[in-house]
């Protein structure tokens, strides 16, 4: 049995208190607690506490400490239940305490995976223009349940997905100006897959791109790559030269007809 002999406020933190006790051998430092724990256990000078009571006090102090760490972590941005659990594990908090902290955070509505999923979906679709597949994968990695994700993605309509995908295409296609139209389409297709769009949405968007095909830019790309390969393969004669040229340009996405026209032009120049 110990008796509390003195309680004083810590100099560096007004919300924490040092508790001094006497176990029969004079006053000594016992432990420190948060103000919440001080009030919860009614700690005051003269109070007698046994080993069981002391164990409860120290356990609740650890819970409160972990709770405040979680609150601080949440102050930067919303987090999922799993993210909070992972954060506390990295802080070497025990599982029993983690469970209590998470339960309290859920009760106090500091964490809510449903709200998180809705806001995350809106941000990733409106700001980063990610497709549903990527958003779903990221939410699953954050521990959000399938049903919650399905609900959050309902407001991400197909029309909005097409709008976002077309914006991405418009931004990216400028960097493919020296590619053939076919190769540009393939690269844009790959980009949209990485961004998380469905095959259906990608097909619709690339069909719209087909209507915008620029013959002049296609010719510029053909001449750019054709002249580059011409310099590379001009050391070869006849059939070998033409075969290497055709293979190289075909791999770049140009049609046989386009390649034949280019080679004919080179023959006439020669």
Swiss-Prot record:
The keyword Transcription does not apply. It is found in: Cytoplasm. The keyword Cytoplasm applies. Keywords: Cytoplasm. InterPro entries: RecX_HTH_1st (IPR053926), RecX_HTH_2nd (IPR053924), RecX_HTH_3rd (IPR053925), Regulatory_RecX (IPR003783), WH-like_DNA-bd_sf (IPR036388). GO terms for cellular component: cytoplasm. GO terms for biological process: regulation of DNA repair. Belongs to the RecX family. NCBIfam families: PRK14135.1 (NF010733). PANTHER family: REGULATORY PROTEIN RECX FAMILY PROTEIN (PTHR33602:SF1). Modulates RecA activity. This is Regulatory protein RecX. The gene is recX.
């Amino acid at each position: 049995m110990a008796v509390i002999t003195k309680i004083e406020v810590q100099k560096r933190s007004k919300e924490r208190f040092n508790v001094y006790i006497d176990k029969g051998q004079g006053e000594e430092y016992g432990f420190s607690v948060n103000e919440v724990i001080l009030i919860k256990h009614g700690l005051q000078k003269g109070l007698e506490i046994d080993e069981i009571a002391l164990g409860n006090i120290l356990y609740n102090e650890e819970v409160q400490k972990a709770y405040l760490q979680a609150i601080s972590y949440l102050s930067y941005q919303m987090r999922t239940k799993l993210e909070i659990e992972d954060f506390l594990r990295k802080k070497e908090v025990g599982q029993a305490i983690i469970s209590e902290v998470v339960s309290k955070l859920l009760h106090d509505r500091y964490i809510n995976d449903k709200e998180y999923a809705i806001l995350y979906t809106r941000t990733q679709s409106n700001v980063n223009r990610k497709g549903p597949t990527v958003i779903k994968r990221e939410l699953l990695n954050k521990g959000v349940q399938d049903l919650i994700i399905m609900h959050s993605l309902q407001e991400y309509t197909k029309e909005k997905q097409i709008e976002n995908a077309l914006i991405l295409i418009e931004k990216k296609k400028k960097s493919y100006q020296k590619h053939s139209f076919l190769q540009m389409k393939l690269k844009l297709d790959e980009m949209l897959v990485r961004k998380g769009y469905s095959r259906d949405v990608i097909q619709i968007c690339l069909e719209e791109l087909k209507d915008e095909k620029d013959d002049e830019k296609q010719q510029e790309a053909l001449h750019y790559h054709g002249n580059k390969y011409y310099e590379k393969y001009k050391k070869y004669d006849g059939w070998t030269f033409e075969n290497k040229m055709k293979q190289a340009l075909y791999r770049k996405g140009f049609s046989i007809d386009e390649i034949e026209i280019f080679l004919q032009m080179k023959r006439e120049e020669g």
